[in-house]
A protein has these predicted regions:
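N-terminal glycine-rich flavin-associated loop
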Residues: 4-42, 69-88
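Acidic/polar active-site rim loop that often engages polyanionic ligands
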Residues: 16-20, 59, 108-112
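Phosphate/pyrophosphate- and phosphate-bearing ligand-binding catalytic cores of soluble enzymes
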Residues: 80-216
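A gly/ser-rich beta-alpha-beta helix-loop segment of oxidoreductase catalytic cores
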Residues: 37-75, 146
Length: 216
């Protein structure tokens, strides 16, 4: 690998609440940010409570679940360009769409984000978060490490069903496996390497493309 990997973690996790706006540094976890919104009586981020990842990554890929996504609540994000320039960009300027933004194409680094919410009732917000957490436990392979839902949903299809129909549920490469509980997840059954995970994903995409002429 020729390049630099920047881990934005412990030193970039501050969360501040001002009225209905929450400003979050990129290293803060989505789960922690969702709890901050709940504690402030703000609704709109319940969908993100169970997504495994950071705010920076969520902005970069326009993360979403259960009918909500980052672009619905994002005011703007501060990014660092390759030239060392700091920019503040709106969701429209970031070209947010389904699991996409211009951040990867332009090699931006997300530093922080501001989200705008609506006032809500704390008990209803918590109830919705609990409801989604229960749904995740029932349907997703939370008993194994994973990076969450792995494949983008092709328009008009469900990725998990395509993978299952291709006979790939349980397909294994080393320690990496297509989950037997939910085919849209790649899990680590123990000792999986990045190379094994990447190879498995490519094989799944290749086999689904061959059988159904659909790219995931």
């Amino acid at each position: 690998f020729r390049g630099m990997i920047i881990q934005i973690g412990k030193n970039f996790q501050e969360i501040s609440v001002k009225d209905t706006v929450i400003e979050v540094q990129a290293g803060a976890l989505l789960s922690r940010t969702a709890r901050a919104a709940w504690n402030a009586g703000l609704t709109g981020f319940e969908f993100a409570a169970g997504i495994p990842g950071s705010v920076g990554g969520a902005v970069a890929m326009n993360a979403g679940a259960y009918g909500g996504e980052v672009k619905d609540v994002l005011l703007d994000a501060e990014v660092l360009t390759q030239e060392g320039e700091f920019l503040t960009l709106t969701g429209e300027e970031l070209d947010l769409s389904y699991r996409h933004s211009c951040i990867f194409e332009k090699n931006y680094v997300v530093l922080s984000a501001r989200f705008s919410f609506e006032k809500g009732e704390s008990d209803k917000i918590k109830a919705r978060m609990d409801e989604l957490a229960k749904a995740r436990r029932e349907k997703q392979p939370l008993e194994f490490p994973s990076a969450g839902s792995t494949f983008k949903r092709p328009e008009g299809y469900f990725a998990g069903k395509l993978i299952q129909d291709a006979g790939l549920k349980g397909y294994t490469v080393g320690g990496a496996q297509v989950s037997e509980k939910h085919s849209g997840f790649v899990v680590n059954r123990g000792g999986a390497t990045a190379e094994e995970v990447a190879f498995l994903i490519k094989q799944v995409q290749k086999k689904v493309m061959k059988q159904f002429n659909v790219m995931m």
